[in-house]
């Protein structure tokens, strides 16, 4: 019916019941649950980036790369999935251990060549199976690094390039609450992308609801237009469409945001 089906895939980590963890894990109490051992050929003993949940995959390991490609192949060839949204793509580096000079958080948020290379490799493999496959990264990093993917193979036919999540929550918060805000970052051009590969959004599962903040912190300077008023706050939420969906390029829309969902 012309509707693309896109999966959210978390290939940066797995949890302790994963068989690739359980075959090489620390399990002193013998309950079948533990963290990866130093011998594990898939997982890092400790996370190599600052936003880890679960157990951190080592994407420089050939076995891990083979596993990821098998997952990609299964979904594309068997289920004809149209694209993947890759969770936490910042986690695909081996360069940022806890004791790294300058701090793990700073390292994770700066340009890492190993991460650029391995994610291009996975994108290439996806496109080799389906040249029209949608590749989307939840990276939320520097423009310099994101440009490496957004502009990658953009001139090919069909045009490729990775779509990058664009978190504009703070800016839209200020705008919707009735304060001065700059939402220029919603455009691909503002980030140095050659084509429209920014998937901008005002709200996601990771932030407080915009509607909640309208009611709690909205601008009350003008008594005739008090943003804390429910009807006014709701009207501002519906305006999200007018000020974001018309910006060229793909968008991510959080469930019922335009109707004032605040739970």
For each feature predicted by the language model, list its residue ranges.
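Substrate-binding/active-site clefts of carbohydrate-active enzymes
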Residues: 1-111, 122-130
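Conserved alpha/beta catalytic core and glycan-binding cleft of carbohydrate-active enzymes
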Residues: 80, 106, 112-262
């Amino acid at each position: 019916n012309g509707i693309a089906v896109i999966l959210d895939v978390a290939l940066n980590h797995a949890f302790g019941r994963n068989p690739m963890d359980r075959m090489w894990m620390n399990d002193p109490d013998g309950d079948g649950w533990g963290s990866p051992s130093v011998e594990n050929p898939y997982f890092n003993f400790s996370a190599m980036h600052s936003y880890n949940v679960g157990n951190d995959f080592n994407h420089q390991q050939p076995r891990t790369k083979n596993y990821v490609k098998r997952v990609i192949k299964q979904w594309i060839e068997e289920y004809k999935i149209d694209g993947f949204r890759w969770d936490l793509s910042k986690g695909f580096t081996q360069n940022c251990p806890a004791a790294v000079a300058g701090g793990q958080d700073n390292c994770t948020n700066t340009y890492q060549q190993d991460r650029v290379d391995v994610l291009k490799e996975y994108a290439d493999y996806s496109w080799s199976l389906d040249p029209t496959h949608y590749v989307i990264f939840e990276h939320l990093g520097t423009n310099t690094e994101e440009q490496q993917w957004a502009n990658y193979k953009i001139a090919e036919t069909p045009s490729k390039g990775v779509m990058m999540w664009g978190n504009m929550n703070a800016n839209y918060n200020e705008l919707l609450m009735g304060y001065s805000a700059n939402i220029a970052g919603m455009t691909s051009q503002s980030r140095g992308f050659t084509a429209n590969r920014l998937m901008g959004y005002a709200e996601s599962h990771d932030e407080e609801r915009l509607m909640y903040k309208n009611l709690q912190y909205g601008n009350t300077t003008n008594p005739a237009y008090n943003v804390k008023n429910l009807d006014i706050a709701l009207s501002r939420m519906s305006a999200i469409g007018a000020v974001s969906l018309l910006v060229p390029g793909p968008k991510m829309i959080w469930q019922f945001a335009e109707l004032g969902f605040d739970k």
